[in-house]
Amino acid sequence: MAFTANGTQALHAAVLGTLAGNRRAGSRLVHSSVEHSAVLHAAGGEGVPVAVDRHGRIDVEAFLSAVSSTDGVAAAALQAANHEVGTRQPVSDVAAALGDVPLVVDATQTVGHAPLPAGWSVLAADARMWGGPTVGVFAVRTGVRWRSPFPEDERESGRVPGVPDVVSIVAAAAALRAVVESQSAEAARQRTLVDRIRAVVPARVPDVEVVGDPVDRLPHIVTFSCLYVDGEALLSGLDRRGFAVSSGSSCTSSTLEPSHVLVAMGALTSGNVRVSLHRDTTEAEVDEFLEVLPVVVAEVRAELGADGL
């Protein structure tokens, strides 16, 4: 196990180190088309994407076929659950059939919220996601070939260069211990709230699509897209009313491209809202959000001249 400055660096280390350690097999990385951008960037031009269904889940046989039919596969990557829509992936089923091909698993959104899947070779996580400080962590199973992709450093057994932030690491461990103690009960509470959001939003807001698997998903994430709505305007309207949410389809100033996750799923990419519940999110706050949302959507549609559509 090794620690990094943040979760992105942990994912980079997990992917690049696994590819470097298995260079004799090749340089290709088979991955789902909805992996975190950090995984896609680390794979570079050597990535082999596998399509997902409307819920954002890969087909096990299709994934394994991509591994077996591609020359020079050094590793595979499959997230435990999606960071935008919450859909869980069949990691254990894939891992059981991969043979000697190592499997890198992004568990960033899963740790502290749900049990980890079995079978991973290299696993990466981010302490911020369970309430800790900005610390990334990755673990390599005994016997898995992994080589540091960073310049040589005598510290941390050469895995990660630089001096580890011991204070933050200890704080991250303490936070994880506290979260895991109540993980099951908190997951059940959050799942009930998310189920309410999934049911009420399409009932109160016309032309909306709730995305992600309705059952096999993380307990704290729910995402939906509203037709005839600008995502940034919707987020701003909700922010003014005290609700901090994000948008999986928000464009970056450099690429002006929608979320690759939503595109891969074939989902509506405009007017997207991602809600992530926290341990201190109350039922009353969810009810208030469900009252405010239809009003904000109507206001944004009116501003765009789409209220009569």
Q: Residue ranges of each PLM-predicted region?
A:
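Pyridoxal 5′-phosphate
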Residues: M1-L309
